[in-house]
């Protein structure tokens, strides 16, 4: 009971309250907000409820916020309702997603590139978003000047390329 901090494999620093450790299963659980810092990948996780397999390095969680390269001026920010992460290979599957890419990803710091979708998966730098929307327009109180909706959006971070299946471009205020 109470506040606790755990360092696992010298890579993952867990900070939470009332952590439960299932020794035989090598599982760490927390039902209260938890912060995890992945030192190797410079990634910050904030999770409301989690289960972590120490042996497999698999993290399951609810109400998740992720900040990649959190110590740099520009970073990607992820918001998921539920997700499962393989921390070894940096892959995931998630539900109810909102991804804000770093502002200068496409060479313009004034943009706010972002995805929203029903679900998402990612492996080897390729992210697939189901029933998604993308825009890079600056955020404001109104809807963006344009967006692309698609049944499937494939974002290749390595190539900085976005592919759409069955897409619809929406342009506003013409």
List PLM regions with ranges.
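Structural signature for solvent-exposed beta-strand/loop edge elements and short helix-capping sites
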Residues: 1-174
């Amino acid at each position: 009971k109470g506040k606790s901090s755990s360092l696992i494999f010298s890579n993952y620093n867990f900070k939470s309250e009332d952590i439960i450790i299932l020794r035989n299963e090598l599982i760490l659980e927390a039902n209260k907000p938890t912060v995890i810092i992945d030192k190797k990948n410079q990634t910050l996780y904030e999770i409301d409820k989690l289960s972590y397999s120490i042996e497999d390095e698999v993290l399951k969680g609810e109400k998740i916020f992720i900040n990649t390269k959190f110590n740099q001026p520009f970073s990607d920010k992820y918001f998921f309702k539920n997700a499962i992460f393989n921390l070894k290979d940096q892959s995931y599957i998630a539900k109810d997603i909102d991804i804000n890419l770093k502002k200068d990803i496409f060479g313009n710091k004034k943009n706010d590139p972002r995805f929203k979708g029903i679900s998402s998966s990612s492996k080897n730098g390729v992210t697939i978003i189901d029933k998604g929307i993308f825009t890079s327009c600056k955020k404001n109180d109104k809807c963006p000047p344009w967006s692309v909706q698609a049944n499937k959006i494939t974002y290749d971070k390595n190539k900085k390329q976005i592919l759409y299946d069955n897409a619809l471009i929406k342009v506003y205020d013409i």
